[in-house]
């Protein structure tokens, strides 16, 4: 089977480990770099350094022929456009483009989550930080709040705002940035990071980037957080998020603490660093979606291949309950 990685960083730990597992089993893994030019041509080499198959014009690309399944790790506009073209050809992409895009719009994410009954933090949108400042000065918005870029991306805005002066500074620094605001809720200074790969849960406690002066004595590094500390309620919230957003590989950020779970973010295909068992789960998912695990090859997008006429691949049996791994 051929598995494609849509990413400009195939050496990312979870991707590299997944690729190693797949190649050890005789599968071919190809990195497709959406930043490398038209159709990611320069990124078609696999971990073994060999180039992808050439098309009629002698160049490599995602459609000559496409791989059996693609893992969509990059979330840039170029990556999403590339993945969408693959989907239009009938090639499965994990996660689907529509689900990935939904998680990049923090307002749309919050609205869908709350409609579905997920305990998502209340979220309001504004054209820019200056609009939030005007709402605070008019008494229509209470501080403290967390201000985030509406559209999630690398190096976007995420800031805790305790007073109007901080909000005024953000308005000057990010004058044209569409934003969302959430109430800043008391916490331990840690975030509970839950990651899910095809229904298998992984978890860790990480220091919150919004930890304030009251958490000055919080030790650096990761906080211990294992399966015994993950309540059934919080595990259920994480699994439900995948159903709501149509995701197979995703992360759910929860506020740490003994109270009711509060979701502050959902991420499509996050890093999942340092989680034993995550590469194995991701490799199994790729094979299942691509059709190899069932023993029934997936028909190619052009309608050819040994799987034509044999029906869909047999789905994996449903789990009796969530599987959990420690961070």
Report each predicted region and the residues it spans:
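Conserved N-proximal alpha/beta basic substrate-recognition cap immediately N-terminal to
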Residues: 7-43, 48-123
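Active-site nucleotide/adenylate-binding loops and adjacent lid/helix of ATP-dependent enzymes
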Residues: 3-7, 39, 43, 52-61, ...
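Phosphate-binding site of ATP-dependent enzymes
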Residues: 156-245
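Short glycine-rich anion-binding loops that position phosphate/pyrophosphate groups of nucleotides
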Residues: 75-77, 151-152, 269
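A long amphipathic alpha-helix within ATP-dependent nucleotide-binding catalytic cores
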Residues: 214-261, 267, 277-295
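A short beta-strand motif that forms the metal-chelation/ATP-contact edge
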Residues: 67-71, 194-196, 254, 260-274
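Intrinsically disordered, low-complexity terminal tails and inter-domain linkers enriched
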Residues: 36-63, 292-326
